[in-house]
Regions:
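Terminal amphipathic helices with adjacent charged low-complexity linkers/tails
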Residues: 25-29, 36, 46, 56, ...
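Ferredoxin-type iron-sulfur electron-transfer modules in oxidoreductases and energy-metabolism complexes
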Residues: 28-38, 42, 65, 321-327
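Radical SAM enzyme core and accessory elements
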Residues: 227-360
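Glycine- and acidic
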Residues: 2, 14-24, 46-54, 113-120, ...
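Canonical Radical SAM [4Fe-4S] cluster-binding loop centered on the CxxxCxxC motif
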Residues: 2-31, 341-359
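Conserved SAM/AdoMet-binding glycine-rich loop
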Residues: 39-190, 194, 198
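Conserved structural-core and active-site-/substrate-pathway-adjacent residues in large, well-folded domains
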Residues: 8-9, 13-16, 33, 82, ...
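Flexible glycine/acidic-rich beta-alpha junction loops that bind and position SAM and/or redox cofactors
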Residues: 60, 90-94, 116-121, 151-159, ...
Length: 360
């Protein structure tokens, strides 16, 4: 079972469409969440409860909520799990309160392999924070962690790809340097690497997506850069990511393509064995449409796009400012620490947060 604990996000990661669309961040009260979770599990019979959101560990009452849930969840054999966690606010207490029934996997989103590129995408985490978080996990008895990255980010070089492998290797080395690690146990670090797809309504809507050939070359280089059997690498198929990029920035001219591709047998495309890339490409060609036009060219900062008429609060000017800061590798603080004038709350008459409180 899954329950949404908050909506929106204060972090401002420049690649994240949901983080911009769902501003401002709103969190549900811990007591209401506890009651809803209890009713949900009682009425469905689920034995695992996921506290879902874009950034669950940013919930201001998370510790209180976990205490409330642990009053009844272990008795009902209901385990608690958190989605991908931020490495800058992970704690020993968080582990203890989510493992009373059974351990779930730990996934940490580092997103990029070098600090320079993390600054470009505004992923405000450092190696020291990654090291601290993994130390807590290993000391708590975990012997495996998953690190989530993206490939094909703006300004990315092969050095950044090598940084992914180096980060994973440093986590492996960290495990073997700890005196409290389990005797006779090995460590497993899994690199999960997605292909970056530029999305509308984000500061990176202006950038072209890497070609499938470029992404495949980067995937090959990543595999060659990993030299430890303790590190496993998973990555997304570049051709399915290409189609995602096409339709993410597409317009009404793509509607006939979808209908025709369906008639030619393109459905259940999320399943690898059902994905017919050649059929999609032939359909584009037969209808006289160049799919690369939509996702593999830069978009002008003043260009009118198929989504320009949509107003979700955040202004075009703010996206341009964030894009320019990205090119300069300048970061932006979480918006509950200082208002950066994105426009998300302009219809409600003021800032989204009371800045006398640090909610993160």
């Amino acid at each position: 079972a899954s329950i949404e604990v908050l909506r929106g996000c204060v972090r401002g990661c420049r690649f994240c469409q949901a983080g911009f669309l769902y501003r401002p961040m709103r969190q549900r009260d811990a007591s209401l969440l506890n009651k809803a979770a209890q009713d949900l599990c009682a009425n469905t019979g689920y034995e695992e409860l996921s506290l879902s959101s874009l950034s669950t560990s940013d919930h201001g009452q998370l510790e209180e909520l976990l205490d409330d849930l642990n009053e009844w969840a272990p008795k009902e054999h209901v385990s608690l799990s958190l989605p991908s966690l931020r490495v800058d606010n992970f704690s020993q207490s968080l582990i203890e309160k989510t493992t009373k029934v059974r351990k779930s996997g730990l996934t940490f989103a580092a997103e990029a392999g070098t600090q320079r590129l993390r600054d470009v995408i505004n992923k405000n985490v450092t190696w020291d924070e990654i090291e601290k978080t993994c130390t807590i996990a290993f000391n708590a008895g975990y012997t495996s962690v998953k690190l989530y990255f993206m490939m094909g980010l703006p300004t990315e070089t092969m050095e950044d790809i090598e940084g992914i492998a180096e980060t994973a290797q440093k986590v492996v080395d960290l495990y073997y340097s700890l005196p409290r690690r389990g005797k006779g146990k090995g460590v497993q670090v899994t690199i999960s690497c997605a292909c970056f797809v530029p999305k509308p309504h984000t500061p990176f809507e202006f950038v072209p997506m890497d070609t499938a050939e470029t992404l495949q070359a980067k995937q090959k280089h990543l595999l060659e850069s990993v030299r430890s059997r303790k590190i496993k690498v998973n990555y997304h198929d570049s051709t399915t990511s290409f189609l995602e990029g096409v339709f993410a920035k597409g317009d009404r001219r793509l509607a006939p393509v979808i209908v025709e591709a369906y008639k030619r047998g393109c459905y259940f495309d999320g399943w690898e064995e059902c994905f017919k890339y050649d059929t999609w490409m032939q359909t584009f060609a037969d209808l006289g449409i160049d799919p690369a036009f939509y996702c593999q060219r830069p978009i002008g900062l003043d260009e009118v796009t198929p989504w320009s008429h949509m107003d979700y609060g955040v202004t075009h000017e703010y996206l341009v400012r964030e894009y320019q800061k990205a090119l300069a590798a300048q970061t932006t603080q979480p918006c509950n620490r200082a208002c950066h004038g994105c426009g998300a709350n302009h219809l409600l008459g003021g800032p989204c947060f009371d800045y006398s409180q640090n909610l993160v």
